[in-house]
Swiss-Prot record:
It holds the Pfam family Ribosomal_L18p. GO terms for cellular component: cytosolic large ribosomal subunit. This is Large ribosomal subunit protein uL18. It comes from Lysinibacillus sphaericus (strain C3-41). Part of the 50S ribosomal subunit; part of the 5S rRNA/L5/L18/L25 subcomplex. Contacts the 5S and 23S rRNAs. The keyword Ligase does not apply. Keywords: Ribonucleoprotein, Ribosomal protein, RNA-binding, rRNA-binding. InterPro entries: Ribosomal_uL18_bac-type (IPR004389), Ribosomal_uL18_bac/euk (IPR005484). Disulfide bonds: none annotated. It comes from the Bacteria. Residues 10-20 have a biased composition (Basic residues). GO terms for molecular function: 5S rRNA binding; structural constituent of ribosome. One of its GO terms (biological process) is translation. Belongs to the universal ribosomal protein uL18 family.
């Protein structure tokens, strides 16, 4: 009998493959996206120093509405772009975290682009 692979395990393998090819620096950090059933998270990471420069999530105080829909992802994209601008970061490397570029991940990326991040 053929056993079906766990979706999350497949995503993690895909993410590891992508991560072997991309990394962030202080000048051009990695914009990492993590999606859960209840929330969405974004971080700007300097992989050379191993430091998170800026982060945003739908769990933060002051965030209203559902935490894990397309509208929430758009708000997080705007927030991460504004916080990056405060730290004088304009260019990033996008890391979709092994997720398909669709739905919440796409909404976050497009909102970040519209608010000044280049990738």
């Amino acid at each position: 009998m053929i056993t079906k692979q766990d979706k999350n395990q497949v995503r993690k393998k895909r993410h590891a493959r992508v991560r072997s090819k991309i990394s962030g620096t202080a000048e051009r950090p990695r914009l990492n996206v993590f999606r859960s059933n209840k929330n969405i998270y974004a971080q700007l990471i300097d992989d050379v120093a191993g430091v998170t420069i800026v982060s945003a999530s739908s769990q933060e105080n002051g965030f209203e509405g559902a935490g894990s829909n397309v509208e929430a992802a758009s708000k997080i994209g705007e927030t991460i772009a504004k916080r990056a601008a405060e730290k004088n970061i304009t260019a990033v490397v996008f890391d979709r975290g092994g997720y398909l570029y669709h739905g919440r991940v796409k909404a976050l990326a497009e909102a970040a682009r519209e608010n000044g991040l280049e990738f």
